[in-house]
Swiss-Prot record:
Organism of derivation: Clostridium botulinum (strain Eklund 17B / Type B)
Name of protein: Probable dual-specificity RNA methyltransferase RlmN
Cofactor(s) required, per the database record: [4Fe-4S] cluster
Alphabetically ordered keywords of this record: 4Fe-4S, Cytoplasm, Disulfide bond, Iron, Iron-sulfur, Metal-binding, Methyltransferase, rRNA processing, S-adenosyl-L-methionine, Transferase, tRNA processing
One GO CC annotation: cytoplasm
Gene: rlmN
Sites where the protein binds [4Fe-4S] cluster: C110, C114, C117
KW Iron (keyword) present: yes
List of catalytic residues: E90, C331
One Pfam family linked to the record: RlmN_N
Chief site of localization: cytoplasm
PANTHER family the UniProt entry points to: 23S RRNA METHYLTRANSFERASE, RADICAL SAM CORE DOMAIN-CONTAINING PROTEIN
GO biological process, one term: tRNA methylation
Recorded coiled-coil stretches: none
Amino acid sequence: MKNILDYTLEELTLWMKENNESSFRAKQIMSWIYKDVRNFSDMRNMPKSLIAKLEENFEIALPEIEEIYKSELDGTEKFLFKFSDGNLIESVLMRYKHGNSICISTQVGCRMGCKFCASTIDGRIRNLTTGEILAQILVVQNHIGERISNVVLMGSGEPLDNYENVMKFLDIVSAEYGLNIGQRHITLSTCGIVPKIYELADKELSITLAISLHAFSDEKRKEIMPIANKYSIDEILNACKYFVNKTKRRITFEYSLVKDVNDSKEDARALGKLLKGMLCHVNLIPVNEIKERTFKRSSKETIQDFANILSNLGIEVTVRREMGSDINAACGQLRRSYIKTQETRGE
């Protein structure tokens, strides 16, 4: 049975035509789904014959909430979801004065191998479908009874390694018939799959592109990010410049500061020189310490010095605000720790 959440309006309209149903029914069905109706029989303006066809061919498949961890400091909530095949993924809800933001996953695991990331330790298990990516937002919205206004594709997985499903997600999540979240309120984070950055640029979307850079030189980047063996920083920056030219959107460069690895004043000056003149912003991230890795986070003083150097070189820079520090877990850690707990219990 097919998950109707995987369908765009155009695809569902085509299905209606192929099954001798009126095309306008597709938009009505979408309206019900994104108003949180979870049973076709509850779609009151649908004829019984169509409801029967829908129930025969489709399901509205949503993951179960396996666990929720809520910060007592700022209300940040970390959700652990379980899909029907038993696979687990994580999403994080962050509450701000301007609205609710959610960080979602695009894959179960990840094959990129970044040394500071927990979600890549066991490799990529599978891609999430378009509907499974959307479902994270739908379930969280239903749980909190509030609208999600900002989406960040920065959870488990590399979005551009699941390109087709993620592009379809971007179509639906921003469409009026879908979740109607403006593209300017959506951020996609990538480790830098260069050909896909060009493809994304050609779509001329208004999303924010965030590049996980984390080093100023290929030599240093190769130490912590295997993708650097395939695509050089120059290639990534050229793709970013193409993206900026096509979309007129500022690029965000993410830079996780790791003690004694990439956090020196020389690193800061070299990074500033590398990015000077680009329409960009640097987001400095105190690295999350995970027990499977030896990386330690830089001191607050080192982070501030790094930020000051970039700022003095004319680079827009911010230090990422830590949310939910009392329930702190790096991306992928919640899933891994839960699986280990279940294995210990013999479940």
